[in-house]
């Protein structure tokens, strides 16, 4: 038996065939229904990402699953991870933007899921001359498309045998990736990949929901803090000293190590802050 996928791009129909696996009979929705219910019960972004890493690893059986978030400068930050006990954790590590260049990110926006079942395998050429009049066949949306040799070498250097990634797209932009690594070659069946893609789409929507809730809660808390400061602010006394006495709750609210205020050459601070000589 074979699993087959079909997509049409630029007027060309592309069929892809792969040997069917024993798990291929299960429908993707049946595989992830329970997982989706668990994700919808999470209350914070951290809990959502931690739970997603654990559940994806349980679904596909890889040695390591990471939630990898792109920062404003293009660098990547591993914000959640589930991995085998014998592996060194990578959570909280950051990687330069050059690890996943802009061109690669555009492909991640086109394809929700990407699988490299064996990093040691040799790519197979495609004879497209007769079908396309000699023009290169665009495999941007192909499931079995080969990947950059540079990326393959990168995975080999990490001692990775197989890799799978699920795109996280929030508001039309690539927010991050669910990156999955296995130390040995590992072929993920088509229905499991479809389940992973569905999970990635729901996860992306859930991120948007949770981030919206967290932003609203933060805004309400900021408003309440500001109202309290204004209500308690003395109508007389030294302005700078009165402001300085309220630096600590402001610093705690934004989770900073310290805060300071500089008015007319006078510096007041709380917690860990820079000396006045560096402010002047």
Language-model segments: which ranges?
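Signal-transmission/dimerization alpha-helices at domain junctions
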Residues: 38, 42, 55, 59, ...
